[in-house]
């Protein structure tokens, strides 16, 4: 980029920056939306561990607090470090161009310090529950920051699969805070659901934002191999979710029916994509469905334990 182009970019960056408060900038820095959605899965893992071990939630409120806060801090710290790492390419993508690391509202040194501090605090909180919960939290952070953000994101189409490991550990953190041996199949079904769910979820997003990823040089599957292969991969991973509820019979027939209907709905919508001419519109529908799917599924897991 020559000097004149740099000046033009800097000038446009300043004029295009939306008005935001410090609180809004901080929430964007730690990706509060991701933190909130993953905190739900942490709580679900924690709640189900209580349920299947016959424990009273009121007697473990301290652990609940340490688990939720510790997990949220680790996720916020990891997301801050991801923003720090991606600050050189985020301006190339529409959905990330207004992040505070791009607009200059937060300096790189502050973002790095904040990320590390939040991670350390999160590990301390989780250590107040069990060592296993803290270890799983470390594995999730290491996978997201190092294996995904620093290594595979800009190098391999498998970056989505690698990143899905970090997104699958939150319910295991919640479970391990109560029952660190992790010897119950429900715990691992939670992990598998989260791991598999993320791949069609993020591939749909990659289709929707394919031009942005291409412009940023990120080798997402639709960028490298096109929409047809991506749609097939989305369908394969979505179908893989279908049998998992039947390994969670301990949650009862109501949950199994809800989960199966959600899976069938996603599969039907997925197959519709092979007949639909507007791939971008279909990818948006798949992305939105995946968000609703996860919320309904995990809330259902909690609700059915009351009956």
From Swiss-Prot:
Under the heading Gene3D superfamilies, the entry gives: UbiA prenyltransferase
Keywords in alphabetical order: Cell membrane, Heme biosynthesis, Membrane, Transferase, Transmembrane, Transmembrane helix
Q: Which domain of life is it from?
A: Bacteria
Top-level EC class: transferase
Q: How does it sit in the membrane?
A: Multi-pass membrane protein
Q: Which Pfam families match?
A: UbiA
Indicate where this protein resides in the cell.
Cell membrane
User: Is rRNA processing given among the entry's keywords?
Assistant: no
Describe its function: Converts heme B (protoheme IX) to heme O by substitution of the vinyl group on carbon 2 of heme B porphyrin ring with a hydroxyethyl farnesyl side group.
What is this protein's record name?
Protoheme IX farnesyltransferase 2
The organism named in the record is Bacillus cytotoxicus (strain DSM 22905 / CIP 110041 / 391-98 / NVH 391-98)
């Amino acid at each position: 980029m020559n000097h004149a182009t740099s000046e033009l970019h800097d000038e446009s960056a300043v004029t295009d920056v939306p008005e935001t408060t410090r609180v809004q900038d901080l929430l964007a820095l730690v990706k509060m939306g991701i933190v909130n959605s993953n905190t739900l899965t942490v709580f679900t893992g924690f709640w189900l561990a209580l349920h299947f071990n016959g424990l009273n939630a009121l007697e473990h409120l301290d652990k609940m607090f340490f688990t939720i806060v510790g997990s949220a801090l680790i996720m916020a710290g990891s997301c801050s470090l991801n923003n720090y790492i991606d600050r050189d390419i985020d301006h190339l993508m529409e959905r990330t161009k207004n992040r505070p690391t791009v607009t200059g509202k937060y300096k790189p040194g502050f973002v790095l310090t904040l990320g590390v501090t939040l991670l350390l605090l999160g590990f301390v909180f989780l250590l107040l529950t069990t060592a296993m919960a803290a270890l799983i939290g470390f594995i999730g952070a290491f996978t997201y920051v190092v294996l995904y953000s620093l290594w595979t994101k800009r190098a391999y189409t498998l970056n989505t699969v690698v990143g899905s490991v970090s997104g699958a550990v939150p319910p295991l953190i919640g479970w391990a805070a109560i029952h660190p041996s992790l010897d119950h199949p429900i715990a691992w079904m939670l992990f598998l659901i989260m791991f598999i769910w993320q791949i069609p979820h993020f591939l749909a997003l990659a289709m929707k934002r394919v031009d942005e990823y291409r412009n940023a040089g990120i080798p997402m599957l639709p960028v490298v191999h096109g929409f047809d292969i991506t749609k097939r991969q989305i369908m394969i991973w979505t179908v893989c979710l279908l049998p998992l509820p039947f390994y969670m019979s301990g949650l009862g027939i109501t949950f199994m029916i809800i989960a199966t209907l959600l899976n069938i709905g996603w599969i039907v919508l997925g197959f519709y994509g092979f007949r639909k001419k507007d791939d971008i519109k279909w990818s948006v529908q798949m992305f939105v469905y995946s968000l609703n799917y996860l919320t309904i599924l995990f809330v259902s897991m909690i609700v059915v334990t009351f009956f």
